Regions:
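Nucleotide-activated chemistry modules centered on ATP-dependent adenylation/adenylyltransferase
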Residues: 1-198
Length: 198
């Protein structure tokens, strides 16, 4: 895609599907959670994908208690999401409890950003700015880290894990609320998943 709101999701999907096919993987493990987005709320722990890597929300296996159905045909695979039932708060509390090192982007820092349609994007060579979009230095952090072309920052003073946990507890916006690729349509994530996106 080209233009001001171009998405690079297709560039991520094709290599993923090629690697799964080439290596004949039975599954790929991901960190998606049901609380992130409504299409992911439909996702199973063992999420069936057809021989083209596509997701069909109507063709998912029942999961009763902790019993998972890993039966598949040749060429099909599963995306397995072991932390599917965790929340954003669960993640941050676990990181804090286990003292896990994480990228600095998750903490507040000074960065040049510009606003487009209510989302503050990092000023970067990968972003084509409109003439009226002026980069300003702000104190921000990223609640979710994805492609720079679709991931927005939030204004934040959260410089420690404790600060982040307090901020998440008080937040009124969703973790993916600053992802422009989710705002393309009501079914944007579901459409990407049907095409093979993780």
């Amino acid at each position: 895609e080209k233009g001001y709101n171009a998405s690079r999701n297709a560039l991520q999907t094709v290599p993923l599907l090629n690697a799964i096919e080439k290596n004949k993987f039975d599954c790929a493990i991901g960190g998606a959670r049901r609380d992130e987005e409504k299409a992911r709320a439909k996702e199973r722990f063992f999420s069936h994908r057809d021989e083209f890597g596509q997701w069909d929300p109507k063709n998912q296996r029942p999961e009763l208690w902790n019993i998972f159905n890993g039966r598949k045909h040749i060429g099909e695979h599963f995306r397995v999401f072991p932390i599917s039932n965790w929340t954003e708060m669960d993640i941050w509390q676990y990181i804090y409890q286990e003292n896990i090192k994480i990228p600095n982007l998750y903490f507040s820092h000074k960065r040049k950003v510009f606003e487009r349609d209510g989302v503050w994007y990092a000023d970067s060579e990968f972003m084509q700015k409109k003439p009226n979009e002026i980069a300003e230095e702000k104190i921000v952090r990223f609640r979710t880290i994805g492609d720079i072309t679709c991931t927005g920052a939030v204004f934040s003073e959260a410089a420690t894990l404790e600060d982040v946990i307090q901020e998440v507890a008080a937040s009124r916006t969703t973790e993916r609320g600053t992802r422009s690729d989710d705002k393309r349509s009501e079914a944007a994530m579901e459409d990407r998943k049907k095409a093979g996106y993780f």
